[in-house]
Amino acid sequence: MSTTTEVVAHHWAFAVFLIVSIGLCCLMLAGAWFLGGKARGRHTNTPFESGIASVGTAKLRLSAKFYLVAMFFVIFDVEALYLYAWSTAIRESGWVGFVEAAIFILVLLAGLFYLVRIGALDWAPARRQFDVKPTTISHANRQKP
């Protein structure tokens, strides 16, 4: 069982690091509060666009396709990291590691083919499922109630 002095002696550097980092954060926040501008007025919270009066809303509406691209990038980027780690240790992993990496790549390719098949990577405008034909109902052929 460790005594308190042994624990303190073992973890003193981490405690000093925590105290210094918390103190530095508090010092920066206090400095910003003291030195920061104190403008209070009608136009304080309005967005500033290089001296031009802002028109409309400041929010941009982005297509969901951009979020899909970002999500695909993150997914395939993380998998590239796994493959890089495997490629640096290929000699130590042997044939078992090669087979595991091949299965991993096949799963990635299956996922990519699935995304292409469902049209997740298609940037063209959506096509209609059916053609809309104009109706040929005339007023003369209509039944009277």
UniProtKB/Swiss-Prot annotation:
Membrane topology: Multi-pass membrane protein
Sequence intervals crossing the membrane: 14-34, 66-86, 96-116
Any one Pfam family match given in the protein's UniProt record, by short name: Oxidored_q4
Annotated Gene Ontology cellular component terms: NADH dehydrogenase complex; plasma membrane
GO molecular function, one term: NADH dehydrogenase (ubiquinone) activity
EC class of the enzyme, as a word: translocase
Localization per record: Cell inner membrane
Keywords: Cell inner membrane, Cell membrane, Membrane, NAD, Quinone, Translocase, Transmembrane, Transmembrane helix, Transport, Ubiquinone
Gene3D superfamilies noted in UniProt: NADH:ubiquinone/plastoquinone oxidoreductase, chain 3
InterPro entries for this protein: NAD(P)H_OxRDtase_bac/plastid, NADH_UbQ/plastoQ_OxRdtase_su3, NDAH_ubi_oxred_su3_sf
Catalytic activity, reaction form: a quinone + NADH + 5 H(+)(in) = a quinol + NAD(+) + 4 H(+)(out)
Main location: membrane
EC number: 7.1.1.-
Family: Belongs to the complex I subunit 3 family.
Assembly and interaction partners: NDH-1 is composed of 13 different subunits. Subunits NuoA, H, J, K, L, M, N constitute the membrane sector of the complex.
Function per UniProt: NDH-1 shuttles electrons from NADH, via FMN and iron-sulfur (Fe-S) centers, to quinones in the respiratory chain. The immediate electron acceptor for the enzyme in this species is believed to be ubiquinone. Couples the redox reaction to proton translocation (for every two electrons transferred, four hydrogen ions are translocated across the cytoplasmic membrane), and thus conserves the redox energy in a proton gradient.
HAMAP family tied to this protein: NDH1_NuoA
This protein's name: NADH-quinone oxidoreductase subunit A
Organism in which the protein naturally occurs: Erwinia tasmaniensis (strain DSM 17950 / CFBP 7177 / CIP 109463 / NCPPB 4357 / Et1/99)
Gene name as annotated: nuoA
